[in-house]
Amino acid sequence: MIDVTITSCGRQDLLKQTIQSFLKFADLPINKIYVYEDSGKEGINDHLKVLFPQIEFIEPCPKVGQIKALDCLLSKVSTEYYFTLEDDWTTLSSGFMAQSLDILQSQPNISEVWLRLRNERNGHPVQPSVYRAKSGTKYQLVKTDYRGQWHGTSFGPTLRRLSDYKTLFPNGYAGVTTFNIKEPWTSEMQVGQVYKKAGFKAATLMNGFVKHLGNGRHISS
């Protein structure tokens, strides 16, 4: 069983697409889905609660930022592995969860598995070698030290171990970084530095399973 966490911030049309496509193609049993809504707007998800009664929506006021939202979500996760999403990704096909799990179970030093299309990796290079997990899943490793500061950590669609988070971040992500709406990528970099220092790397599947929906639809402060 896998718990699923989704961060959302006022883009309910995209959130709806994200949830619908994920549910359509999820290929492992889901325990619980949690959505943290950080728009600060009451009632914004009322229509989605009707569409998705199985989802627990967390809707605090005021806004807290993505880092504290993630920490809140992860405090609710009870499964060994969890899948994390943002509100602006569409899932394209099935098989990504089982393949990601194969990699994480085969390689304890891999912290997450990317699902992005090759042209949506923001230029982040991968190592040329192709590896196989225990059940045959092919993957590559995401290069560390890209532009001197990117090590492969992403808050986008990935499967992760809850134990890694609890071990490396005893005070949560908020213990090592804060969310800056003007430079939201900096928190990913700072969290990534912790993973790199501990010897972790990110992997990517050979084929892309998700596509970004949010180009030009940035969250507001």
Task: Identify the residue ranges that each predicted region occupies.
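A short, glycine-/small-residue-rich helix N-cap motif at loop->alpha-helix starts
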Residues: C61-K68, L74, L92
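A conserved acidic beta->alpha catalytic loop
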Residues: E37-N45
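Short, acidic, metal-binding catalytic loop of nucleotide-sugar glycosyltransferases
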Residues: S21-I30
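N-proximal low-complexity "stem/linker" segments adjacent to membrane-targeting elements
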Residues: M1-Q20
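Short aromatic/hydrophobic "clamp" motif used to bind/position activated sugar donors
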Residues: Y82
